[in-house]
Amino acid sequence: MEHYFTNNQNLKSELRDINFSLNENNFTFKSDNGVFSKNKIDYASLFLVKTFLTTNKKEFNNILDIGCGYGFIGITLSKLLNKHVDMFDINKRAIHLCKMNIEINKVDATVDESNIYENVVNNYDLIITNPPIRAGKSVLMDFLKGGLARLNKDGELWFVISKDQGAKSVKKELEKICTCELIEKSKGFWVLSAKN
């Protein structure tokens, strides 16, 4: 079985459109085989975006979507917040789709290839992610701890994780090195915000 966090360029392409509306804004996302949630907007990602938009009161100027896939989180936030968003992913097909989706949705965003934070050179006010849980706990913690290391002063790391996939233990582990707050729960998913 192929994982969305790998890079199999030989996988047959079957391009498809995912149409989506939020806050009276319409979006179209190109998707394909070999990317995360290829047939529909993932519930956890949508829950993360909606929770952020309804509960966050701070203004963030530079935003990073790490492990962006075809760009749902970053593109949606860029459009609804009217902000530039940087996005990174390891999957070349996801990056190609994300570039198309930036153009289709006419947002101010960039996407580049990076194995987690390997090619990320800037620091950010907001880092937001639906991390690849299936890649294992070590990769998950690299996503989260690496994000904390790349936050500007007063910056925040927002992420979503399933209770069944260790939300409690991840929160506990992060609390050893930072403040980690549970923002919202829904259908077994937790949205958390961490800051130094």
Task: Go through each PLM region and give its residues.
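Conserved class I S-adenosyl-L-methionine
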Residues: 162-177
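Conserved beta-strand signature within the Rossmann-like core of class I S-adenosyl-L-methionine
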Residues: 154-162
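N-terminal auxiliary segments of SAM/dcSAM-dependent transferases
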Residues: 1-24, 34-38
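A short glycine-rich, Lys/Arg-flanked "PGG" loop and its adjoining helix->strand segment in the class I
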Residues: 142-153
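A short SAM/SAH-binding and catalytic strip from SAM-dependent methyltransferases
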Residues: 125-138
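Core SAM-dependent methyltransferase catalytic element
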Residues: 185-196
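A short linear hydrophobic-aromatic micro-motif
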Residues: 178-182
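Conserved SAM/SAH cofactor-binding pocket of Class I
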Residues: 44-120, 126-129
